[in-house]
Amino acid sequence: MSGDPGKDQPNLFYTKVPQTVAHDTLLLQGKVKSVYSIANEPERVYVHFHDKVTAGNGRRIDFPEGKGKTCCLISALLFEHMEKRGIKTHYIDCPNLDTLLCKKLTIIPVEVIVRNIAAGSIVKTTTIIEGTNISPPIVEYFLKDDEKDDPLLTHDRVRLMGIDPTPMKEVALEVNTNLQMLFTLMGIDLVDFKLEFGYDSHGDLFLADELSPDNMRLWKKGTKERFDKDLFRKDEGDIVEAYKYILTQLRQFV
């Protein structure tokens, strides 16, 4: 596996010269990311990735060095990959190794999960065995609310909240198709992943948040070796080294 992105092998991971990003007002402090306004640019924000990992809705925390940069660079590559395929995202640029420049959105309080292989909560709450292929993939919705432990929502409940889930589902399945094709080239199974969406000031829907192993499950084909946050959840290995492996592979295929 490779070294720290942006240090010992900068050209392998990113081709741009890092810039100094001056943060303005903090708009939102998440578990592992911070969102900042930009002076004189009301339609744009900076999204800063921290060297931090959490599990259990923040009940378990660690601060692995290099994790923020790695997730940021993976997200930049995958957002660019989606944009090239006609999927609208909040991504604009990656001005620094740990910071994205993004469109300012009103985030929809619903997390969208796409499942291709059974793992995680679907195994814990049903009789489905881990590793079972799910074809066609299923799309689930969860309320974005840590205090309520992000409960599962039905399609109708999302509609009762005043949100039409259909456009999000359609985009999520498009993202799934494109990610599956990409990860298959890398010898990786895309088990499942979480997406967030938001509206811009014109009411247009955009893919938001991040695209990284922090919000995906990635297994090596044939062995089920993990390259995602389950390594931290299950205390099975070094997530930064696993994430760097994914970043190195992505650079060869996107």
Where are these predicted regions, by residue range?
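Conserved metal-phosphate-binding beta-hairpin within the catalytic cores
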Residues: V114, L190-D209
